[in-house]
Amino acid sequence: MSNRPNNNPGGSLRRSQRNTAGAQPQDDSIGGRSCSSSSAVIVPQPEDPDRANTSERQKTGQVPKKDNSRGVKRSASPDYNRTNSPSSAKKPRAFQHIESFSETNKPHSKSKKRHLDQEQQLKSAQLPSTSKAHTRKSVAAGSSRNQKRKRTESSCVKSGSGSESTGAEERSAKPIKLASKSATSAKAGCSTITDSSSAASTSSSSSAIASASSTVPAGARVKQGKDQNKARRSRSASSPSPRRSSREKEQSKTGGSSKFDWAARFSPKVSLPKTKLSLPGSSKSETSKPGPSGLQAKLASLRKSTKKRSESPPAELPSLRRSTRQKTTGSCASTSRRGSGLGKRGAAEARRQEKMADPESNQETVNSSAARTDEAPQGAAASSSVAGAVGMTTSGESESDDSEMGRLQALLEARGLPPHLFGPLGPRMSQLFHRTIGSGASSKAQQLLQGLQASDESQQLQAVIEMCQLLVMGNEETLGGFPVKSVVPALITLLQMEHNFDIMNHACRALTYMMEALPRSSAVVVDAIPVFLEKLQVIQCIDVAEQALTALEMLSRRHSKAILQAGGLADCLLYLEFFSINAQRNALAIAANCCQSITPDEFHFVADSLPLLTQRLTHQDKKSVESTCLCFARLVDNFQHEENLLQQVASKDLLTNVQQLLVVTPPILSSGMFIMVVRMFSLMCSNCPTLAVQLMKQNIAETLHFLLCGASNGSCQEQIDLVPRSPQELYELTSLICELMPCLPKEGIFAVDTMLKKGNAQNTDGAIWQWRDDRGLWHPYNRIDSRIIEAAHQVGEDEISLSTLGRVYTIDFNSMQQINEDTGTARAIQRKPNPLANSNTSGYSELKKDDARAQLMKEDPELAKSFIKTLFGVLYEVYSSSAGPAVRHKCLRAILRIIYFADAELLKDVLKNHAVSSHIASMLSSQDLKIVVGALQMAEILMQKLPDIFSVYFRREGVMHQVKHLAESESLLTSPPKACTNGSGSLGSTTPASSGTATAATNASADLGSPSLQHSRDDSLDLSPQGRLSDVLKRKRLPKRGPRRPKYSPPRDDDKVDNQAKSPTTTQSPKSSFLASLNPKTWGRLSAQSNSNNIEPARTAGVSGLARAASKDTISNNREKIKGWIKEQAHKFVERYFSSENMDGSNPALNVLQRLCAATEQLNLQVDGGAECLVEIRSIVSESDVSSFEIQHSGFVKQLLLYLTSKNEKDAVGREIRLKRFLHVFFSSPLPGEEPVGRVEPVGHAPLLALVHKMNNCLSQMEQFPVKVHDFPSGNGAGGSFSLNRGSQALKFFNTHQLKCQLQRHPDCANVKQWKGGPVKIDPLALVQAIERYLVVRGYGRVREDDEDSDDDGSDEEIDESLAAQFLNSGNVRHRLQFYIGEHLLPYNMTVYQAVRQFSVQAEDERESTDDESNPLGRAGIWTKTHTIWYKPVREDEESTKDCVGGKRGRAQTAPTKTSPRNAKKHDELWHDGVCPSVANPLEVYLIPTPPENITFEDPSLDVILLLRVLHAISRYWYYLYDNAMCKEIIPTSEFINSKLTAKANRQLQDPLVIMTGNIPTWLTELGKTCPFFFPFDTRQMLFYVTAFDRDRAMQRLLDTNPEINQSDSQDSRVAPRLDRKKRTVNREELLKQAESVMQDLGSSRAMLEIQYENEVGTGLGPTLEFYALVSQELQRADLCLWRGEEVTLSNPKGSQEGTKYIQNLQGLFALPFGRTAKPAHIAKVKMKFRFLGKLMAKAIMDFRLVDLPLGLPFYKWMLRQETSLTSHDLFDIDPVVARSVYHLEDIVRQKKRLEQDKSQTKESLQYALETLTMNGCSVEDLGLDFTLPGFPNIELKKGGKDIPVTIHNLEEYLRLVIFWALNEGVCRQFDSFRDGFESVFPLCHLQYFYPEELDQLLCGSKADTWDAKTLMECCRPDHGYTHDSRAVKFLFEILSSFDNEQQRLFLQFVTGSPRLPVGGFRSLNPPLTIVRKTFESTENPDDFLPSVMTCVNYLKLPDYSSIDIMRDKLLIAAREGQQSFHLS
């Protein structure tokens, strides 16, 4: 990260690069995104082996123990079958992907155990001095750091969930010290460099912990994580130290092997599945293990011995080593099956006995599990998803952990130590490493404990201070065996010493640090709650009170119930205003946590605090406000069924304050919090109509209008422009509008809605399941888990496996217990009937008699009228512009309510500006049942209320036509069509909209992705089942109790029904599973459930994934009933309203249609109808309101398309004449043959514009492009972190599941090894090339000679070190193997999932019952079957093509170069005869009546698309039809944009799942390239990034443009983008030379390039952006001879190259031409520079960087291969002076031609006339021109050109040659080199999404424009001491808005590193520009200091200057002087 500091008053200014958190302002809001991911000591996270390694065997304990396990999930289950394996060193990411599963397990021999135990004791006894010395050193080191820790602890420096790169910056703070330490102290330093990002990602103590870890380097507590070792250590102080003994065993195995490193890197351990014969219920496996009694004996003796020698480090009892269960984070990971082990309950029983044998251990286990309520399923009171929403996470168990060895290795490798040295060194280093760190901690703690219990207060104070130091420097690793249960009571005693504030403060602090360092200790610290609260009730010392708040805040994350029931909520808020801001935040966070699972019985605890919390909403502090909002949202969520409580919570002040909060500009609330607050309002309105009435009276309509459309400018009815909002925000806002209106009735036309809800045979919401924690409290499971358990219970399962939050539990129905499969912890469960399950609490289908909203409509019609007028248009616009099905359905319901309750006059008023009829027509043609039903209902209401108007419109717009079609259709909606219409989209008709809630008190779920308490609404399409696919699928494991059931374990009924629903002939088979049942298409696209308009908030039990066990009959009955209803309703509709229609066609509504048909018939190609028919069409289009339906049904589109494009000999009139006629009629250009003498200029384009708009309307109505989105609301009520959409839940699914593949040698080849490793499990999102790497480094890529041995050469585990190194170090390895599924060759860059999905046999089988749109995760078969992938070597002759098929780059074929043989002839003609090729007319390409080759999709709107394509081409290139026309497009391209297609494209491109699987619909990419004009630039730019590069870049781009996705849980998973970064250091003095070298090395690498400058500490985004800007400047140097233009000397603010000349061309740079006689050496040099430029530009685009090159338009035309159509018009863009001369000379040529064509001229008069043709009074001969290029006398236009004068007779040839040489021939060699360089990075064909004039935006960012204060206020973020109201911020905005172009560039380069902003300006700057206050000592004057910056995060540290003039001066000085240096501030 790069700081540009300028805090020295006058002199040398430096820009700073501070990577410590301390450099950042002391708050946690910076934590979002930061730039630098490294300093010298950082090894990128993805290279961690164990992240990629989740496996079935790990889940059961058959995993070899890995030392450097990161992200390890600790599991306490003993595994007696395990072999030790060598400690894995780090594997590169390429090999994390795949592991085979096969490893035999051997029991340990007892003698070996004893021997190792003795050896361990002996060794540990030998190093006492080392460990003591180290302990002293670390404590001493800690004390000074501790002071810093104390200062910053309450203002969390970093949010715990900061990005990885942020953590890296912090870590890189002190690299130099580390290098100089001894091995021992390197350990301490090394732990500083642990991966704080992974720890923080799920750290239970996020903000505060991160604060400590970032400010306290050595021995940092960055890992509170856990692995298998820590589980034991913190459970029992006397338990052995596993790491040491395991390392010694590893050492004995790997001691001297130099292969250690590679073997560990590239050979993940493999375990073969053992056959097992365990009977059901058996609790023993075949291998002998110590029984429970043996365990007890061992434990007892061990405990005695450790008590005797508590000073010496204990050894480990190998048989008690725990298995690990790791989070998979690579791209492919292997898994093996569960081993037999003990039966689930048997193992648990053994563990329980083992624990009972050791009372202390047992007690601690109980306590620790009580502490970790997150270990239980998600319903826990301490659920982490809720905390996630406000940046608090609670899971201690899922924290990542780097082993120290891994960190040391990372450090030393970064310092240049060869990795292979780690082979022999590894075990010894790690052994030394551990001995020094762990030995002293527990003995030290025991000494301090005695001090705490002493009688002397000074001794106690000293002890508690040292205890603080020990804890603040420690973590679970270093504090193994810390006596928590003894220390906590002692500290509580000290906390009660009221007279001694110091002791109290330190005791409180020690308890806080303890919870940070040992998260599970919070279960013991709970006892201190009453004492903490005492400190808040009577404040004696403010420090103690604030420290108590910090401690309580940490406790509240897991033990909020205990705090609430102790009255803690009120106590925390008692003296709120007296506390510092951080303490206030803590108090409000405690309040929010206490409300998390509050029940109605506990309301009295919070009631008195509500006024204070309500008032707090008006506060300015963002975090305080968000906590308060969270508090109310949780209350409303938990009390949603208690109307009286809701009214007490929602006082008038609350509604007013929240309303104001929503409209504050700039917004205080983040997107997630905004969604939560709006959802809270919806819940209130739907459950308590009186609150809805109150909101309407408070003018909520204006608020909503503002939120959707921005500030109103008075003409809201005329033009509605929606502000950009995420789909989730739109969904919530439309839900709220819907709930503000009364509910629809239940009878009449709406009766069908109730029918849609049926089909739920099994009521899985009928009961609530709860589990009991160790304190005896019952917690409900979240709703979806409760449903899963209930469904299994109902079908009589004995047990099910429930996977939640990354842990697996067995729910045993016989013993009513939940058993954690990893730890064996058993908890009681119970089933309670759900009182809400059968009552209709939603108020949906019955219009409650006392619905206050309906009363209001009657009593206050004016209010109702204004509400409807304000919002109807907005709703309509939301419907039209949204592609996501959920939003559209919700809008439809809201519109229906409005239309139903509005009276006729009002309706007439609000509908007059909207094309309602055409929308209804397109809705009726939809394939989505819900939409069709809604459209019929709407049509019926409108005809009842406004029959006169709509009887005409319904005829004209095609509604009648569609309704008749529905009424007559025999096969109504029977087969699901391929495409989904109108964006109701694939999932539009998905799972039914149940919004049931398990219980009012249900916890906001702890699973980030699963909806817990989704609030009621019409169609809150509850995707919880799909969202929890991971849980459901994990049940398909082989049960441990033997073959009781088949391999899959979903309840049998589900399977049965599933199959019946899919196809009646299918019998029950393992193929079916929940996943299948979750696919709506499997039970009929238009089934009853799929359209369950659970129209009002259906809080009743809905249809869940399990409830689809409804019988086939019910489902098909309902489907048939609804089809019947539609048909019957359509029939009635026609009878009622259109039966009396005159059949003679004389209806006045048909007049326009008849006129249009007549005119269309005259557009006949066989007969010349002149221009009259076009004139008639023009008048119809321009003057009448012809409808899309009429245009469609008149045949006009097809006929006009043929008229404009046909080039048939039989045509009566040629195409060019027809085109000119068309232009004449629609554009007023001259008629054919009547061209004027002067220039043809555009006159009026209104008729053409009207035609384009009509065509676009037609397209919107007809198109049926499917959108694969997953945008169902996934919010957990008000409780949690809101995933943006279901896509992130699906990502989570991919994160937890793998595809099983069998690798097989292809039958065609026998010259490579056969794979014998059995099936492998592969990450679905791994690329095919990952499998290649996996095989190649194991020798499978080596082609054998015939005489070599066959298959038995070497084991699968042998790694070819050279190949592995090659794969590691090079991004561009030659492919050795190719892969097939069946006959299909797989591209290397395709995901394995996509390959299997597209090509596997199973996929073929399943295609008839499922498709991509409806089920993104594929049928269950994909996940349960084994897919065969064949491999064979790449043949030599195929290698070149292989790159194209699937290499990373797939280079496009470049155009033939000018020197190729086929060009030789043309060259000669040009040189000898002066013949140059004619200019290509770009119109020709578009004038075709059929789709071009690259359009493969089918759609009803295809003809309209082709016509629009032709119209756009004519508008853009019309001047090619005329000799002398003005080069300007008729209609701006922006007028062709289709808003509906744009909405679909944007929605599609916001979906993370689609991007990760590369599953972009073909229509989108094809339209993007063939018809880019349909989409705005931003959309195409996103489409480009998604399709042109790897998916990591696409995901990164998505996260950059949609920050709210970052709030979802996808960030910490392995699907988060993992972009490799390569850092290079360059010297500023030789920048260009070194840049060329860097591009040569890394240009084509996939890694992101990061630049650092020599002797500067800055690294990351800022220096890298500056690198591109500076290299761009260097390339413009005049001495390089690259560009044409004038030489200027630029003032260089800094640097040594003063006086350097640069080329400047105001029109834009273009290549300097070469003649035929140019020196080859010079040409080669220039070509090399252009090749480098190509690489630089491509790399900049690829890495999202900007270059600062002002290139001309012709340059970009060359890039897009449009050079053949360059004309004299393009000369104006490179040399206007020459261009003007050429234009005048061309005028002479045109006059000459006219004279020659004049038949009346005689030879003499012609000769005379020609001689009088002059330019500025001079004849052509007098101009003295010769055949050389103007401005370049050395470049001859043809051979001997210097000696050929230009005359009137050869003038035309001369002009053609000048244009051709200047734009083509003279520059072709440079551009060929440029293209070669560019295409070495990625193919140029991907740029087809853009027009030439747009490439400047893509490459260089936004154009310079003035900055206005309003935009700056919206886009910039004041923080850390400043708000938008601060004087300094207002000064700054005023100054920036007055900057000129040069000052803007200076400022931007100073703050961001680049002189230009990205497209979109400040809005697109990522991270946003943040202005923070620069602080000084009280004696210092801010006016004496300069501002400084951190370029990586776009931070401007601005002193609070006394006046605006001083600020302006200081800013400009800093910006000028602070260039080109990155130093520490």
Curated annotation (Swiss-Prot):
Family (UniProt): Belongs to the UPL family. K-HECT subfamily.
Keywords on record: Acetylation, DNA damage, DNA repair, Nucleus, Phosphoprotein, Transferase, Ubl conjugation pathway
Positions of modified residues (N6-acetyllysine): 181, 1458
Chain positions found as N-acetylserine: 2
Name under which the protein is recorded: E3 ubiquitin-protein ligase TRIP12
Biological process annotations from GO: DNA repair; DNA repair-dependent chromatin remodeling; heterochromatin boundary formation; protein polyubiquitination; regulation of embryonic development; ubiquitin-dependent protein catabolic process
Phosphoserine modification, residue list: 12, 77, 85, 100, 310, 312, 975, 1024, 1030, 1049, 1063, 1350, 1355, 1362, 1409, 1460
A Pfam family per the record: HECT
Reaction catalysis annotation: S-ubiquitinyl-[E2 ubiquitin-conjugating enzyme]-L-cysteine + [acceptor protein]-L-lysine = [E2 ubiquitin-conjugating enzyme]-L-cysteine + N(6)-ubiquitinyl-[acceptor protein]-L-lysine
UniProt entry tagged with the keyword GTP-binding: no
GO CC annotations on file: nuclear speck; nucleoplasm
Region described as K-box: spans on this chain: 1529-1603
Active site (UniProt): 1992 (glycyl thioester intermediate)
Polar residues bias spans: 1-10, 18-27, 78-88, 119-132, 280-290, 326-338, 360-371
Regions of compositional bias (Basic and acidic residues) in chain numbering: 48-70, 346-358, 1050-1059
EC primary class: transferase
Spans annotated as Disordered: 1-404, 970-1077, 1441-1466, 1601-1620
UniProt pathway: Protein modification; protein ubiquitination
